[in-house]
Regions:
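N-terminal targeting and processing segments of secreted/endomembrane and organelle-targeted proteins
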Residues: 13, 23-24
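C-terminal motif of bacterial Sec signal peptides marking the signal peptidase cleavage site
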Residues: 16-20
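Positively charged n-region of N-terminal signal peptides that target proteins for export
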Residues: 1-4, 8-9
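Mature, Sec-exported extracytoplasmic domains of Gram-positive
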Residues: 24-229
Length: 229
C-alpha cells in the first residue's frame, strides 16, 4: 500500500513538473516571437521612393503653403553647375529654386537625385555653400533663424537643401526662432511622409567667430555675389 501511495505521489510530481516545463516553453516561444516581430519592425527598410525631384519639391511646397513658399525663380543648369560646382554628369535630375531677391530673401530649395556614390559629395558641396549663406546673414541679418534652421537631407540617392517657410517680421529673436522651428517641422514631416522615416539634418552651422562668417566676406561694403540678388 505504501509503495502504491509513493508511486502515485511520484507520478503526480512528474506530471506537475512536465506541465510547468510546457508552460515555460510556451512563454519562451511567445517572448521569442514578440522579440522577433519587434526586430523585424525595426529592421524594415524604408519604403521605395520613385518620385522625381520635381514631385518631391511639390510636396515640400504644399507642406509650407502657397502663401509662404516664395521660391519663385528657377536656377538654370549652367548657373547651378557653376555656382555650386556640381559634377552634372553625376546628377540624374534636379530642381533648384530661389527667391528673385536673394539678397533679402534667402529662400532656396534644391532637390536632386544623384548617381550611386555621389550623394555624400553633393552634401559636402551644399554645406560649403551653406557656410557662405550663414556668413552673409551674420553680416546682413535678414531672416537669421530661417537660414540657421536650413535643412540638408540625404536619403539614398536623394539629396535636398531647403531654406523655406514663413518669414518673421519683427525684432523678437525668440519668436523668430519659434516660427522657424514650426515651419521646418512641416518640412520634416513632409520628408518623413515621402521616405517613411524621420530625416536627419546634415546642415552644418559654422562657428561664429565674430567676423561676419569667418572671413568668407570682406569687412567693407563690397558687393557680395548672391544668386538672384
Amino acid at each position: 500500500m505504501k509503495k502504491l501511495i509513493a508511486f502515485i505521489i511520484a507520478a503526480m510530481m512528474i506530471a506537475s513538473a512536465l506541465a510547468a516545463c510546457g508552460k515555460t516553453d510556451d512563454q519562451n516561444k511567445t517572448k521569442t516571437t514578440e522579440t522577433t516581430t519587434e526586430t523585424q519592425k525595426k529592421e524594415e527598410p524604408p519604403k521605395p521612393v520613385t518620385l522625381t525631384p520635381a514631385e518631391i519639391e511639390a510636396r515640400i511646397k504644399a507642406a509650407i503653403g502657397e502663401k509662404n513658399y516664395i521660391c519663385n525663380t528657377k536656377i538654370e543648369e549652367d548657373s547651378f553647375a557653376s555656382y555650386y560646382g556640381f559634377d552634372m554628369t553625376q546628377i540624374k535630375s534636379f530642381v533648384a529654386l530661389e527667391n528673385a531677391v536673394g539678397a533679402v530673401n534667402p529662400d532656396t530649395v534644391i532637390i536632386m537625385e544623384v548617381k550611386d556614390g555621389y550623394a555624400q559629395t553633393a552634401v559636402n558641396i551644399l554645406n560649403e555653400s551653406f557656410e557662405g549663406k550663414v556668413g552673409y546673414i551674420r553680416l546682413y541679418p535678414f531672416n537669421v533663424q530661417k537660414v540657421l534652421g536650413a535643412r540638408l537631407f540625404m536619403e539614398g540617392n536623394y539629396v535636398a537643401f531647403i531654406i523655406a517657410g514663413a518669414s518673421y517680421e519683427g525684432e523678437n529673436t525668440e519668436e523668430e526662432a519659434k516660427l522657424a522651428a514650426a515651419e521646418y517641422a512641416k518640412i520634416d514631416n513632409a520628408w518623413e511622409a515621402i521616405f517613411g522615416k524621420k530625416p536627419h539634418n546634415l546642415a552644418i552651422i559654422p562657428e561664429d567667430k565674430g567676423n561676419g562668417g569667418g572671413g568668407l566676406f570682406p569687412s567693407g561694403d563690397e558687393d557680395i555675389p548672391v544668386i538672384g540678388g
